[in-house]
Swiss-Prot record:
Protein name, as recorded: Long-chain fatty acid transport protein
GO MF, any single term: long-chain fatty acid transporting porin activity
Membrane topology: Multi-pass membrane protein
Keywords in alphabetical order: Cell outer membrane, Lipid transport, Membrane, Signal, Transmembrane, Transmembrane beta strand, Transport
Record-linked Pfam families: Toluene_X (PF03349)
Subcellular location: Cell outer membrane
Gene3D superfamilies assigned: Outer membrane protein transport protein (OMPP1/FadL/TodX) (2.40.160.60)
Chain's role: Involved in translocation of long-chain fatty acids across the outer membrane. FadL may form a specific channel.
Position of the signal peptide: 1-25
Main localisation: membrane
Length: 435
């Protein structure tokens, strides 16, 4: 595998792996910004204002709060993603639990200024992915370790025009940190089998040889906006937008292969003998539109729904360059725009207890021909339930749980053919307090 190809796949895994855990929405997007939302499959988030977390989705909801309100919690993600297959070398490609468990924390604060103005702030994560394979995995040249975390800092404000219309605007600062490692696996054996003249060199590369290590971190900036229309106190609708965020990763590349191996022109990344090279990669995180609604159809019952549209077609290629300006790779990705649809219901049992449930469908933006075991993306179906217990008018606790089921997919990557299947359980809790 050439350095150009290796960097293409490594950078893809790094750039789209923006998460503190495995991504559990389509593509590499995260929804886990609140536990109440988790319990309703994040349906109606732009129009519901039951806790401060909703403001991170729609800043116009700030006008629905009459007291400073705080919410903090986390969602625990327990994925079960398995890969199967057989390499041309006859070595197994089976790997279980390639996505690690992790916590996705969230913190939110909302404060009214007067009857017309208010502000809010939040700390969340909106994109990401993480996968881990054994160092001696046969498909190590496309597997290995992929881990990238993001933190989204949002500051927003809102203005109420009248009893019906409210508008909000926010600023996003996104910090991303990435790490990718790739190993030789059986790539040396495959090269030796195809070209016996190279067998003395390629055939001697141990499976756990680190053929690529890439890490980097950077800030990116964007904005979000929202409109809230209140037909009356029981019916409201929202339109929200979150902009594209450009991340210019700056980092290091190295390979443990001895430099002398470069003269054989093997299909593996250029060896550095453990030395480090500097490089950079630009990734455009896609923009998202969402339409939401909330209807209190009875004194104790409400329904809520959302349709989100993410412009994944903005993610068409990946290009990595050295600091000298040389193109290390250029690869067409061809993602397609995708949607997410969610529907839920809430039951207001009494002043203390609230129960909710929801279902959702995540459309995968990754075309079948572009799937990777570092991004084993697939269409996903959500089933969710949750509850809120209010201790009094000031303090409450949210609990939510979701089960996510992904369809089985086939992946063709390099000389390998895989099958992937995945599911996940998500558990969340938040504490809310109004001052």
């Amino acid at each position: 595998m050439s350095q150009k190809t290796l960097f293409t796949k490594s950078a893809l895994a790094v750039a789209v792996a923006i998460i503190s855990t495995q991504a559990w929405s389509a593509g590499f997007q995260l929804n886990e910004f609140s536990s109440s939302g988790l319990g309703r499959a994040y349906s109606g988030e732009g129009a519901i204002a039951d806790d401060a977390g909703n403001v991170s989705r729609n800043p116009a909801l700030i006008t629905m709060f009459d007291r400073p309100t705080f919410s903090a919690g986390a969602v625990y993600i327990d994925p079960d993603v398995n890969i199967s297959g057989t390499s041309p070398s006859r070595r197994t490609l089976d790997a279980d639990n390639i996505a690690p468990t992790a916590w996705v924390p969230n913190v939110h604060f909302v404060a009214p200024i007067n009857d017309q103005f208010g502000w809010g702030a939040s700390i969340t994560s909106n994109y990401g992915l993480a996968t881990e394979f054994n160092d001696t995995y046969a498909g190590g040249s496309v597997g290995g370790t992929t881990d990238l975390e993001t933190m989204n800092l949002n500051l927003s404000g809102a203005y109420r025009l009248n009893e019906a219309w409210s508008f909000g605007l926010g600023f996003d600062a996104v910090y991303a940190r990435a790490k990718i490692e790739r190993f030789a696996g059986d790539l040396g054996q495959l090269v030796a089998a195809q070209n016996p003249a190279l067998a003395p060199v390629a055939g001697q590369i141990p499976s756990d040889t680190k053929i690529a290590h890439l890490n980097g971190n950077q800030w990116g900036f964007g904005w979000n906006a929202g409109i809230l229309y209140e037909l009356d106190k029981n019916n409201r609708y929202a339109l929200t937008y979150r902009s594209e965020v450009k991340i210019d990763f700056k980092g290091n590349y190295s390979s443990d292969l001895p430099i002398a191996i470069n003269r054989f022109n093997l299909p593996i990344p250029t060896a550095t003998g453990g030395a480090t090279q500097s490089g950079y990669l630009t990734l455009n995180l896609p923009e998202m539109w969402e339409v939401s609604g909330y209807n209190r159809v009875a004194p104790q019952w409400a329904i809520h729904y959302s349709l989100a549209y993410t412009s994944w077609s903005q993610f068409q290629e990946l290009k990595a360059k050295s600091t000298a300006g040389d193109t290390l790779f250029e690869k067409h990705e061809g993602f397609k725009d995708a949607y997410r649809i969610a529907l839920g219901t809430t039951y207001y049992y009494d002043d203390n207890w609230t129960f909710r449930t929801g279902i959702a469908f995540d459309d995968s933006p990754v075309p079948a021909q572009n799937r990777s075991i570092s991004i084993p993306d697939q269409d996903r179906f959500w089933l969710s339930a949750g509850t809120t217990y209010a201790f009094n008018k000031d303090a409450s606790v949210d609990v939510g749980v979701s089960y996510m089921h992904g369809q089985s997919v086939k992946i063709n990557e390099g000389p390998y053919q895989f099958e992937s299947e995945g599911k996940a359980w998500l558990f969340g809790t938040n504490f809310n307090y109004a001052f």
